[in-house]
C-alpha cells in the first residue's frame, strides 16, 4: 500500500492519518454548535438544559468533533447573560436590537461573551470566529456588520490587549 494517494487532478497528496482535530478546530466546532443552540433558545425559549440534552443525544450533530466543555460554557454563559451581553453592543448598533436578524443576534452574543468573559481567547480570534459564523449561517453581508460591531466592542472591553498588540507591532516594524 502506498504512502501517497492522488487527488482529483492526479497530483500526489500525502496520505492522511487519523489525525485528531486541533484545539482551535474543536473550539470552532463548539462555536458552530453553540450558535445553533443559542438560536434555538432565542426562537423557542426552550430551557437551556433541554437544548443541551438534545444536542448531546442527537446523533446528526457531531458532538464528538467539538470541545463539549466549551460548547456547554458558551451555551450556558450566553443564555444566562444575554441581557448583559446585549447592553454591551446595543449602543453600537445602527438599528434597534429587535430588528437584528436572529442569527446575527446569536453570533453577536457569542462574540460579545468571548470578548467580555473569555479573556484567554485573543480578541482577534473571538472576532474572526464570529465573522466566520456569520459567513456560514447569516445573511449575505452580515459578516461585515458583525465584524464592525465586535471590533468596536473590542476597543472598549479589550483596550489593554489591543494597545499591547499595537505596541508589539510597532517594535517589530523598527
From Swiss-Prot:
GO biological process: DNA-templated transcription termination; transcription antitermination
An annotated GO cellular component: cytosol
Keyword list, A-Z: RNA-binding, Transcription, Transcription antitermination, Transcription regulation
HAMAP family in UniProt: NusB (MF_00073)
Superkingdom: Bacteria
Species in which this protein is naturally found: Marinomonas sp. (strain MWYL1)
Protein name: Transcription antitermination protein NusB
Pfam families: NusB
UniProt xrefs under Gene3D superfamilies: NusB-like
Species lineage: Bacteria, Pseudomonadati, Pseudomonadota, Gammaproteobacteria, Oceanospirillales
Biased composition range(s): Polar residues: 1-11
Job description of the protein: Involved in transcription antitermination. Required for transcription of ribosomal RNA (rRNA) genes. Binds specifically to the boxA antiterminator sequence of the ribosomal RNA (rrn) operons.
